[in-house]
Structure formats: structure tokens, C-alpha cells
Amino acid sequence: MSATLFEKWAKNPENLASVRDAIDATAFGDDSLEKFSQFVNIQRVKSGDPIAVLGGYDDVGKSGAGCNPTFTTGHIANTLKRWDLGDWQVAKKECYSAVLGTFAEFALHAGTQVGDLTDTEIGTVYADKLSKAIVRMIWRLAWFGDKAAKLVSNSGVLTAGTDKTMFDVCDGLFKRIFTQCASNASQLTAIAANGKSTYAEQKSAILAEGVATGILESLLMDADSRITSNSNAVVLATKGFTDALHHDIKVKYHINLPWTTIFEGFDVTEFDGVKIARVAVWDRIIKAYENTGTALNKPYRLVYADPRNLMVGSNADGLLSELDIWFEKKERMNYWYATGKLDTQLLEEDLVQAAY
């Protein structure tokens, strides 16, 4: 049987003697759970829990005075929606034979316990890498989830060959933002470059002089005054857009847009007093899963809102569940399992301005 784990690490004397001696590939550094939580509002909820928002009283005051006025009933704006948590699971199994023939074989137990990887360096590395993959799953579901997910071939946006069950756990924040902008066009600032038919055309269009700064200026002008007056509001943007913005400002004004790295990976800057955060995780997900092979689906995206308005809910204290790890003696198989629930909501749908 050929190795399926560490398959490129042949067990030769000149190779490493331990999995721990391998060098970790350079991490992106911006896709941790800590960074995810900086710009969303995480809630512990149950399916069916309400989100009730109380608005203002209808406008009042009509002409007239004197005795016997006409009395009418009034109305106070209000909305009610409910959480609808979807289930996610991660279920993995491995047999020790997956590492036979590689130098990871040196980490196996001897004798009867050879099949148990749980307390070996192999199991430690496996659990660590799997846990990080689960965090990336949270990013993917919370922002790109779609209960009606479809492949490009079925009039959807998912790349050919993608397993749609990796997305249909819940409707993510982008799905909710797209739906809201479809119902209220004033909340959308259009980006023409997204509609181009090839990667090169998309990039060329966004890099044209004045385009990126024009989009951002329009986004800020189009936004509800309750967003622009909110000191907590931030513009979240794909790396593709922020790179174009940096280029445009450099060309137009001959200055470099200053970026500050925070939270060990998030880059932020300010434009006309408004904070902008570069969310490169979005770009990677779009390139991996919303790619037709000739063009990307909305590679340039901006979301302008108070993070309090971007809600992510789970029924547990945190978004991540503890990874359950065990060795099944009868099957001589190692198992890793985690499960949880997830949903998203926009607290106030009218307090998001988007560009795409």
C-alpha cells in the first residue's frame, strides 16, 4: 500500500528522522479565529432565538390647530427575525499504514500499539493542521456560505468540482449582503471591473486611473449617514481592491497609502478618516472556490459597516468545537471528529453599504 500521509517523504537514510524536524510552510497569518472575530459580532444563540430591533416613530405633524383635532393611530418601526443554525461536521480517519514507507514511520509505536497514532508526533501534527483547517472553514462558511450553493455549471458561482456541502451549512454574510442590495439598490456601489470576462480584463479595469479611488469615494458618499457618523464603522475589502487603491493613490497623488499591520496579519489604513481593513482571506477563497477558469466571481468587494452589525451565531461558547480524537482498537483506525452549528445575520439590514 502506498503512503497517503507525508507521501513525498520517502524513508531514506538521507531524509529526516522525525516529523517534527520538518519546517512548517509559511502561514498566511491572517486567517486565525482571533482575526475573524475582530470584524464580526459573535453571538451564542439557539435556532429560533429572535433578533428584535426597535426603530423610530413614524413622522408626525400636520397643519391645523384649534378644538376637536383628528386623532390617528401611530406606528413604531420594528423588525423580527430568527436564527436558523445549520450543522457542520468534520470527520476524518487514518490508518497507520498511511505513513508506511515514509520517515514518519519512525514515529510509530512498536508491537501491538503500532496502529495508535493519537499520542505520537504524527497524531500531534495531524490534529494541529486539522484544527487550523477548521478555522479556515469558519471563515468560508460565515462569509461565503449559501444554503442554495450551486456549481458554475448549474448557474451558480462555485468552481467546477467543488463539493457544495462545503458551503450549504448556512447563508453567509455575503449572501445576506447580496440579498439586501438586490432589494435596495441604493446600498450597492457597483464595480464594473467585476463584470469583465477574463482575469486580465478584471485586473486592467480596476487598475485604470481613478477607478479604485472613485469606487471608495462613491461607497462612502452612498452610505447611510448612520454608518458614516459611526466611529466603529470600517470598510472591509479584498486584497485585490486594496492593492488597486494603493496603486491608484500612488499614481494620482504620488504618495504611498500607509498600511499598519495589526493582530499579526490584518493590514489597516485610513482613507479620508475612514478605517480600511484588507481581508486577503476573501481573495484566497474566491480564487479557490468562485473561479470559472477564466474569471473570478466579484474579486473586488467592499463592505462598509459597524462590525456589530455583522452577526455570526453558534450554540456554543465559541465558534470552534473541541476536536474529539480516539483510536478504535477493533478497526485499528484513528479518528478525529468535530461538529457545531453556525448561522449569520445582519442586525440592521439598512446599515450596510457594499461595493462589488
Where on the chain are the PLM-derived regions?
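Sequence/fold signature of self-assembling virion shell proteins
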Residues: A3-G48, K164-E217, T242-Y356
